[in-house]
Amino acid sequence: MATLLIQLSVNGIIWGALYALLGLSWNIIYSTTGIFHFAHALIFLAAGYAAVLITMNAGLPLALGFIAAIIVAVVLGCALERGIYRPLRILGASQMVIFVASLGTLIFGEAMAHIIFKPFPRRLTGFPVDTINIGEINFTTLRLATLVISYFVIFGVWQYLKRTKSGKAIRAVGSNPEMAEALGIDKNKVFLFVFALGSAVGALAGVLYTLDSAAHPQMGMPLIFPAFIVTFVGGIGSILGVTVAGLLLGLAENISLAWLDTDYMVMISFAILLAAIILRPRGLLGSGR
């Protein structure tokens, strides 16, 4: 039993890193713009398929698949901001209207993916996968890479937001958009940029997930919910909170498999979210915005 729990904990730490990366990609956008960007799930989907098309169909290196995924995701994210969210803001639409528009966009996008790519999973290969054994505990080089890449990107984004002028502008708009505009910060440019940044981070998460699983038309939904959960559990606008929440979610889901079937993982995830909302409405380390 002890070996099983250690193995599940290792799995949980790895998945927790990916959950944190997913959460970061959505948290950046939500904490800055206040938009409940449900269509962010399309970013994961588009990135996964872009990598598959470049790597598997065109026969190009996986590195180019990553680059293509980021480009496609950034273009799509910016298009959603400029083509849907900004016009709705100009018209004075409520957050509920914007949310419904985002949800409708997601449903339409998934339907188009279903028509174009068919409902069959598309595998993505190209990463050298070997098994690392430490005693009776094992994990693959791909999952180790997922862990390292996820935390490296999270650290990089944290440093960017903390130390650069544009990063401070993003934080200023997220904290007080009216004051930021009074200081000469162009809110619309910041909104567009955070959609690009969040989409780029989301693309990396989407490709890492596709490498471990596969690309399919409904892949965005299983990824967007962990992004929501770690954002609200960790705290809106808190990168450290998202990182901790991702780790907790990954551990909780995987360790529970020692006693429960995989069908209960979603229930556990939302139980954590519900408990966090009741006990810590602002999240573990959030500002409460």
Where is each model-derived feature located?
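Cytosolic-side transmembrane-helix boundaries in multi-pass membrane proteins
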Residues: 116, 175-182, 186-189, 260-289
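Single transmembrane alpha-helix segments in multi-pass membrane proteins
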Residues: 4-57, 83-93, 97, 235-239
